[in-house]
């Protein structure tokens, strides 16, 4: 009888231990499942971060590409501005040469006008001499008349020359006015061109500053891309580690489930043995 009681106590103790182990196995299983879910959540979070890192890398790559395109456009604008400056300098030189030629034509016209005035004075003096001789010497009337006709012819010729010179003078004055107007326009244009040149120079300096700024940004983007690449590698490593951890935990869960099943079988066997013992006691 004592042996049976002792055996029953041992069976009860084994049953309690089996229950404790079963509960512990259940707790371990739940903890493993919680840890597995936590790792799965971390894996999803890491995958999202990885996707965000890839998107950010694409964004910086696109920004770097835009910066390079803007830099190329700035260099093209600077080249075009230099070509415009050279063209404007050539135009200024042509205007200055045309102004010099106009001034030379004006000086020639003034000289011809002075010569015409001298010829007119000489003609007037000749007519006075002829008239004086006509008054003093009537016997030489025919000669004087001839001389008078000649003088008139000379005077008429001089008048024609004077009119022609005057007409040419008007034309020359008109040319001079146009030349002065063109000179004023040229001076105004030169001032505008100088102002445009200053603007182009300032724009060129601004473009150079922007190019330097873009170069600095490019270095910064390259450094950020390098940092992001390192973070990407680190995230990939963590993701791989998390996947391996999940695999291990899944295997641990399977092992725990197997152990739980074995404990249940053992508990069932102990319960059956305990029932048999109770039946034996009842029979006694």
UniProtKB/Swiss-Prot annotation:
Main localisation: cytoplasm
Composition-biased stretches (Basic and acidic residues): 12-38
Modified sites of kind Phosphotyrosine: 261
Modifications the protein undergoes after translation, according to the UniProt entry: Phosphorylated at Ser-283 by DAPK1 in response to oxidative stress and this phosphorylation enhances stress fiber formation in endothelial cells.
Pfam short name (any one): Tropomyosin
UniProt cross-references to InterPro entries, sorted A to Z: Tropomyosin
This protein's UniProt keywords: Acetylation, Actin-binding, Coiled coil, Cytoplasm, Cytoskeleton, Muscle protein, Phosphoprotein
Function, as annotated: Binds to actin filaments in muscle and non-muscle cells. Plays a central role, in association with the troponin complex, in the calcium dependent regulation of vertebrate striated muscle contraction. Smooth muscle contraction is regulated by interaction with caldesmon. In non-muscle cells is implicated in stabilizing cytoskeleton actin filaments.
Record's subunit section: Homodimer. Heterodimer of an alpha (TPM1, TPM3 or TPM4) and a beta (TPM2) chain. Interacts with HRG (via the HRR domain); the interaction contributes to the antiangiogenic properties of the histidine/proline-rich region (HRR) of HRG. Interacts (via N-terminus) with LMOD2 (via N-terminus) and TMOD1 (via N-terminus).
Name of the featured protein: Tropomyosin alpha-1 chain
Protein's gene: Tpm1
């Amino acid at each position: 009888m004592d042996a049976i009681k002792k055996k029953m106590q041992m069976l009860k103790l084994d049953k309690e231990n089996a229950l404790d182990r079963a509960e512990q196995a259940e707790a371990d299983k739940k903890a493993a499942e919680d840890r597995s879910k936590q790792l799965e959540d971390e894996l999803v979070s890491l995958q999202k971060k990885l996707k965000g890192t890839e998107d950010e890398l694409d964004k910086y790559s696109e920004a770097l590409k835009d910066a390079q395109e803007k830099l190329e456009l700035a260099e093209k604008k600077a080249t075009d501005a230099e070509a415009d400056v050279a063209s404007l300098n050539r135009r200024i030189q042509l205007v200055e040469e045309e102004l010099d030629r106009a001034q030379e034509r004006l000086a020639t016209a003034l000289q011809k006008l002075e010569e015409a005035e001298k010829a007119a004075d000489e003609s007037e003096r000749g007519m006075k001499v002829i008239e004086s001789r006509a008054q003093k010497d009537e016997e030489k009337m025919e000669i004087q008349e001839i001389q008078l006709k000649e003088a008139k012819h000379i005077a008429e010729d001089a008048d024609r020359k004077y009119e022609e010179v005057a007409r040419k003078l008007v034309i020359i004055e008109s040319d001079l006015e146009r030349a002065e107007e063109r000179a004023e326009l040229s001076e105004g244009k030169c001032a505008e061109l100088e102002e445009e040149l200053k603007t182009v120079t300032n724009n060129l300096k601004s473009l150079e500053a922007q190019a330097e700024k873009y170069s600095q940004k490019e270095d910064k983007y390259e450094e950020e891309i390098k940092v992001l690449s390192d973070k990407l590698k680190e995230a990939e490593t963590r993701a791989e580690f998390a996947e391996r951890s999940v695999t291990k935990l899944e295997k641990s869960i399977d092992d725990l489930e197997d152990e739980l099943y074995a404990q249940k079988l053992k508990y069932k066997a102990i319960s059956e043995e305990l029932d048999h013992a109770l039946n034996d006691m009842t029979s006694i």
